[in-house]
Amino acid sequence: MEHHIGCMDVDVNNNIKPTELIKCIQETANGQMNARKPSYFELFWDRKSFIITRFSMEIYEQIHQFDDIETRTWTAGERGATFFRGYEVMRNGRCVARASGDWAVVDTEDGHIYKTKEIDLSNYESGDKPELNINEKFRIPKNMEMEGCGVHHVVLSECDMNMHMNNTQYANILWNQIDGILDKEITSFNIKFRAEAKFDSDIMIMRGVPAVGKKSKSGEKANAADGSDANHVNSDDQNQDGLIIPKYGDRAADELAVFRTETGGKTNVEAVFGLRVIKR
């Protein structure tokens, strides 16, 4: 699917905002469903809906206003109750971003989760699961100190037909809470969905922003992939207080921003951004 990036899609540094990029990606999957069947609506009227449990994205080159991009998607296997999906974003024949998503199908009335063998997606284009550098199964350590940084009220314009906040919205909401974001660009985004946020509910946002990748366990500076000296995130991804996101793997990042949100007394999402300081 082709997309033209406009002035409303980019931030003050002329880089595409995370939610806008994810919307391009997810709309491509929606288009595939509509063309190949079953469509979103066919599933919905049969009391079924896809819910996302995990989304991981790497951005290799920033996307700007007036860029024309092409988004591609495919089903990438299944296991148990989880369908895997791959995504690529192309610009001028180059892959500028790649992503992976984990999805399940639920009954929209009673919450029953279907096994993959009960849902026929054989008409969809399929391929291999993308190999990402970042750790898709990251964990926020229990001892990482998190500080409250905001409350977001879920409004109707953010919700999908299930009356929950659409998964694409979270990226911008959390991105807005990153310290010093005016001088940074995103190299990766990784999010786990734990509980849905209903329309008219409040989301409590908690933040921990570790300065990572400065040193490895041995005290040596981390090196870039080409062996050069760099402040890249290494396998010990560690902040100033010794708190760790184990083996996060974003070697393009200078630091990470870590978030956890809650709604209705439950953990809502957990997310990590890889960030690079913009050289001016």
Describe each model-derived feature in a short phrase.
Residues 1-52, 98, 107-187, 267-270, ...:
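Hot-dog-fold acyl-thioester-processing enzymes
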Residues 53-59, 71, 188-193:
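Short structured motifs
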Residues 174-210, 261:
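Glycine/small-residue-rich hydrophobic helix-like segments
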Residues 53, 83-85, 187, 203:
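Residue-level marker for the onset of beta-strands and adjacent loop->beta junctions
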Residues 1, 58-59, 63-139, 197-199, ...:
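HotDog/MaoC-like acyl-thioester-processing domains
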